[in-house]
Amino acid sequence: MPKLKLIGVDLGGTTFSVGLVSEDGKILKKVTRDTLVENGKEDVIRRIAETILEVSDGEEAPYVGIGSPGSIDRENGIVRFSPNFPDWHNVPLTDELAKRTGKKVFLENDANAFVLGEKWFGAGRGHDHIVALTLGTGIGGGVVTHGYLLTGRDGIGAELGHVVVEPNGPMCNCGTRGCLEAVASATAIRRFLREGYKKYHSSLVYKLAGSPEKADAKHLFDAARQGDRFALMIRDRVVDALARAVAGYIHIFNPEIVIIGGGISRAGEILFGPLREKVVDYIMPSFVGTYEVVASPLVEDAGILGAASIIKERIGG
């Protein structure tokens, strides 16, 4: 009897990816396509279904996991709303995909899918208490406690990117001032670099980028490695914000491991070294040494593996 394979769908506002995944987390096949949100939800759903059938052709793959941005009803498979999909309101996504593919479909918020991917296939394997944070255009995350995903009453808990770390800081898209997302996301870093050009125009960051408009997190951390004063100043602000947030998560959830993923996590020790040191400054002594702070090993495949892990979570591994 052939081994069961999993289908993971990483749904984004710009592109979506569908992957065929082995039970031990190897991606056997992957297709990425433009989402084309402007064509409307019917077209998006149709093309996702077609891609699922393409990827699973000839394979024993009866289950699909899908990680979606926005507010979702995980039990009923409904996307309530998503800023990435303006015309999606109470869309019964799992039912629609099941009708078109003949497969059992499970839905989860993409940030929750990220922590599940770490639990089953990433740095969280073997751990029952996990906090996972993904640093990209925005900041999302999820929490596993006693081996189970923490979702809250309405399934929208663990909004880790929206803890306030700078009460008088930049305005966040959510309408609150000083959220972690407004200080430590890739979007926030690009904004800081644009705003800093007038005063710090001689910074190595801008030489590496070619112009202030092109300057991003990669240029920032590359310049910081070479000791650029402005780059280190922004790096320290990002680290302080992350450390305050992570310290809060440690106090509240008492995790064994804090996993940080997303594009910014690729910065390596120029980010993680000072972050680990700063977290210690903000936590109670009794918590020191009870946790690890690590980079996600999943990198580009985190979305598909997270989506595939939804299946393992729902059908019992």
Swiss-Prot record:
Instruction: Give one GO biological process term.
Output: glucose metabolic process
Q: Which Gene3D superfamilies match?
A: 3.30.420.40
Q: Pfam families given for it?
A: ROK
What cofactors are annotated for this protein?
a divalent metal cation
* pH effect on activity, per entry: Optimum pH is 7.3.
Q: How is the cofactor bound?
A: Mg(2+) is the most effective ion. It can be efficiently replaced with Mn(2+) or Co(2+) and to some extent with Ni(2+).
Q: Care to name a GO molecular-function term for this sequence?
A: glucokinase activity
One Gene Ontology cellular component annotation held by this UniProt entry: cytoplasm
Q: Any idea which UniProt keywords this protein has? A: ATP-binding, Carbohydrate metabolism, Glucose metabolism, Kinase, Magnesium, Nucleotide-binding, Transferase
Give the enzyme class.
Answer: transferase
- Its catalytic activity? D-glucose + ATP = D-glucose 6-phosphate + ADP + H(+)
Q: How does activity depend on temperature?
A: Optimum temperature is 93 degrees Celsius.
Catalytic activity, EC: 2.7.1.2
Q: Cite the record's note on assembly.
A: Homodimer.
Q: What does this protein do?
A: Catalyzes the phosphorylation of D-glucose to D-glucose 6-phosphate using ATP as the phosphate donor. Can also phosphorylate 2-deoxyglucose, with lower efficiency. ITP can also serve as a phosphoryl donor.
Give the UniProt family note: Belongs to the ROK (NagC/XylR) family.
Official protein name in the record: Glucokinase
The species this protein was found in: Thermotoga maritima (strain ATCC 43589 / DSM 3109 / JCM 10099 / NBRC 100826 / MSB8)
